[in-house]
Amino acid sequence: MEQEIKPKRPFCASCSKPMKLCICSRFKSHHHSINNSIAVTILQHSQEKNHPLNSTRIAALGLKNLQVFAVSDIHFDARFEIQLNKRSREEISDAHLERIQKNGESFDLDEEECVISATMTKFGPTFTDISHLQCNQCHFKNPNFDEVLGSRVGQDAVSNGFVVKKLQREGEELSEHEEFEISVPPGSALLYPTKKAVAVGVRVEGFGFEVKNLIVLDGTWKKAKRVHQPKAGCLSTIESIVLALKVFGEDGDGLDDLLEVFKSMIGDQVRCKDEKFRNMKSSNTNP
């Protein structure tokens, strides 16, 4: 006896929701996304994309100046290459750090690519190539991220922007493959709760620079721990983005519209769960 194959549910190509739960028409200005002056870069866990309450889909439909990059777990190891922008290299040169020892030989910084390379495993990061940090201001052994960020090279990279590339390896015998390459512009700030974080909404002046780009980690807090060192929070991705953009002076009315869409999406999920529960209860009571 052949088993009947149920047809798959149709999904919306824009919001990735089932057609009967499509949210595209719920935006008050669904023909015109908000032209946010502060860019938003979302690093989304690969398993988060199809989650029913994934709110990045709302940000993608409602904000023009936005990029989303998929980030996966590290099962074996991954190598991160950080390429400094030209301005960073010039500032290091101006600080008389042109000649740095590399494998016992001198080289001119302007003639070399200024790259910081780190390998990340399940057990944490290891800097495998920090030759550009071996200068009179960077005397440390086996540096951690805080030490690298505190160095002149690290500070210049944060101030002037950089490009980071992730090369993933799934096993010892397998070759690397590029997962992403992201350009982090000057004025970028990570929207994430840490002990050293500046509280959003307290005072904009506390950042010490003009914020032009927000970097947001999208995933459950358990998944996000693998990307950073978090402290649990309670806001969704879209709620966090809206709050931050409002603090920096973006259009409040348009941003509130995004929150209304999110609330309606939560309502859909609650109704679907209730309906599923009722159907299960009904099937169990019927003879």
What is each model feature region?
Residues 7, 17:
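Flanking scaffold residues of small Cys/His-coordinated metal-binding clusters
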Residues 12-15:
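Short cysteine-rich clusters marking metal-coordination/redox-active sites
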Residues 19-22:
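Cys/His-rich microdomains that often coordinate metals
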Residues 25, 53-62:
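Histidine-anchored nucleotide/phosphate-binding helix
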Residues 26-38:
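Short cysteine/histidine-rich metal-coordination sites, predominantly Zn2+-binding motifs
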Residues 45:
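Cofactor-binding loop segments of dinucleotide-utilizing enzymes, especially the Rossmann-like FAD-
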Residues 64-226:
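S-adenosyl-L-methionine/SAH cofactor-binding core of RNA-modifying enzymes
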Residues 207, 212-214, 219-287:
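C-terminal folded domains that constitute the principal catalytic or ligand-binding module
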